[in-house]
């Protein structure tokens, strides 16, 4: 979500804001998201919606969909109806298919307001 916001507002990637240093070691994603949302709002931009693809063999996303959407809603200030979450598998291919990794893709729509 953070990188999708940064891309939409034409900023650098997450590593620029939170480099791989001792200061940010084990930092939790919600703590990183807060200043990014602040920058978004400061730029007079609002999020219209998020479309999230969670790519994993297990667990089945459908089991956790509502909980994840509620969490993202709380962290972003978006209405749950503005967040779409889909689960995808890779049919047991690669590290994701072997349940050793999970990937996520996020598409964001934003609008500038005055």
Segments the model singles out, each with a brief description of its role:
Residues 1-67, 75-76:
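RNase III-family endoribonuclease catalytic core
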Residues 63-65, 94-97:
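Short, well-ordered secondary-structure micro-motifs
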Residues 70:
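Active-site phosphate/pyrophosphate- and oxyanion-stabilizing loops and adjacent acidic/basic residues
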Residues 74-77, 106-108:
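Short, surface-exposed linear patches
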Residues 79-82:
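Short acidic capping loops at alpha-helix termini that bridge into adjacent secondary structure
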Residues 85-89:
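Pyridoxal 5′-phosphate
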Residues 96-114:
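C-terminal edge-of-domain segments
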């Amino acid at each position: 979500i953070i990188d999708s916001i940064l891309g939409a507002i034409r900023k650098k990637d997450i590593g620029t804001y939170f480099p791989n240093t001792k200061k940010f070691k084990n930092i939790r994603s919600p703590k990183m998201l807060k200043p990014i949302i602040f920058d978004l709002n400061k730029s007079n931009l609002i999020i219209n919606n998020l479309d999230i693809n969670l790519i994993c063999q297990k667990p089945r996303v459908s089991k956790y969909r509502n909980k994840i959407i509620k969490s993202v809603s709380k962290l972003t200030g978006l209405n749950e109806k503005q967040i779409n979450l889909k689960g995808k598998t890779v049919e047991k291919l690669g590290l994701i298919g072997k349940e050793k990794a999970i990937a996520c893709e996020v598409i964001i729509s934003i609008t500038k307001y005055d």
